């Protein structure tokens, strides 16, 4: 029998080694690295089934507007998928009520915005423009002063804005919030503003806007109502200006225009699940679970989810369930 040349044996050995190395790399990619919250598209966010909260009980709250109701449902449903019992307190009447419910122990968690925490709850007067610095500042201060934990924030920014119809923008010649001052001075009858009751009294709401921009809105031009009604009232022409949330899907659906915040008054409003320190200490895995949830909630996603409720007519629990399934959190 003719023997195989040593160089041929070496070549076969090299090929075999390469094949084994490539197979090992492929196996690592498929199994994942086990890190907290991977990037990428739908279905890569992790599964609630990876967490076992059987025997645990949580009370979940939220504020009363669409985005908050969706976030509340996402929180409730993902916790239920871990085996936890969840008491539903979703839909509390505003920031102050929700915050008091959290600090008093009536609820264990709800999503709050960094700007609201900094200005409204901590009483600071100067917002921090950089989102990461703002999050770190409110997180550290609230934990030290109030034993409230701010979990990993979502990337979307639901800051306030003033919206107008495109035709109103052209007729009144307004491009920025500063331009409103000219309308108030020269044509006060046109300075009509649909505004939420809470926004009318918040330091980061109308009082702060008036102070920062140097104008005072005529009292007879203010129409106070629930935030959810403002968009249709604005589109119907009942007001020339309206206070809106930038992530609301109705802005695009109704073709509304946003005025530039040329004084950079409005703070950053990244949402974070707020949890009392004692609750997180008992279940520290909440941090990992909701880091995976939060990273998937970018601005485009939140606008789409809001529009599914406010424009398409779906319920918040339906929207939350579908999104959690699409992202792989619910099996």
Spell out what each predicted region is.
Residues 160-170, 270-283:
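A bilobed periplasmic-binding-protein/Venus flytrap-type ligand-binding module shared by bacterial periplasmic
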Residues 121-151, 238, 250-263:
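Ligand-binding "clamshell"
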Residues 55-92, 156-231, 314-318:
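Bilobed "Venus flytrap"/periplasmic-binding protein-like clamshell domains
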Residues 25-52:
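Short, low-complexity, disordered segments immediately C-terminal to signal peptides
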Residues 20-24:
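C-terminal motif of bacterial Sec signal peptides marking the signal peptidase cleavage site
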Residues 55-56, 67, 200-204, 208-212, ...:
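An extracytoplasmic/periplasmic, membrane-proximal ligand-sensing/linker region
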Residues 108-112, 239-245:
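Paired acidic/hydrophobic, glycine-rich loop segments that form the ligand-binding mouth/hinge
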Residues 1-12:
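Bacterial N-terminal signal peptides that target proteins for export
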């Amino acid at each position: 029998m003719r023997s195989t040349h040593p160089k041929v044996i070496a070549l076969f050995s090299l090929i075999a080694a390469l094949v084994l190395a490539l197979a090992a790399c492929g196996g690592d990619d498929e199994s994942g690295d086990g890190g907290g919250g991977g990037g990428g598209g739908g279905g890569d966010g992790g599964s609630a089934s990876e967490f076992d909260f059987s025997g645990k009980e949580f009370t979940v709250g939220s504020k009363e507007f669409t985005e908050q109701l969706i976030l509340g449902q996402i929180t409730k449903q993902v916790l239920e998928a871990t085996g936890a019992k969840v008491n539903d307190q979703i839909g509390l009447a505003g920031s102050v009520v929700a915050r008091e419910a959290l600090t008093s122990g009536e609820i264990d968690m709800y999503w709050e915005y960094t700007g609201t925490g900094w200005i409204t709850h901590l009483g600071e007067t100067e917002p921090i423009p950089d989102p990461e610095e703002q999050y770190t500042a409110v997180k550290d201060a609230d934990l030290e002063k109030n034993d409230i934990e701010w979990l990993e924030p979502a990337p979307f920014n639901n800051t306030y804005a003033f919206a107008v119809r495109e035709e109103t923008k052209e007729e009144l010649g307004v491009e920025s919030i500063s331009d409103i001052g000219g309308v108030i001075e020269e044509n006060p009858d046109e300075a009509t503003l649909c505004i939420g009751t809470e926004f009318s009294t918040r330091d980061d709401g109308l009082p702060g806007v008036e102070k920062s921009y140097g104008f005072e809105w005529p009292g007879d031009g203010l129409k106070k109502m629930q935030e959810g009604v403002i968009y249709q009232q604005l589109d119907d022409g009942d007001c020339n200006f309206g206070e809106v949330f930038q992530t609301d899907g109705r802005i695009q659906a109704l073709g509304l225009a946003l005025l530039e915040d040329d004084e950079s008054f409005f703070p950053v409003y990244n949402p974070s699940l707020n949890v009392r320190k004692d609750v997180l200490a008992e279940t520290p895995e909440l941090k990992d679970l909701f880091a995976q949830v939060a990273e998937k909630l970018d601005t485009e996603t939140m606008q789409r989810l809001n529009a599914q409720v406010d424009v398409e007519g779906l319920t918040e629990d339906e929207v939350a369930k579908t999104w959690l399934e699409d992202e792989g959190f619910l099996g």
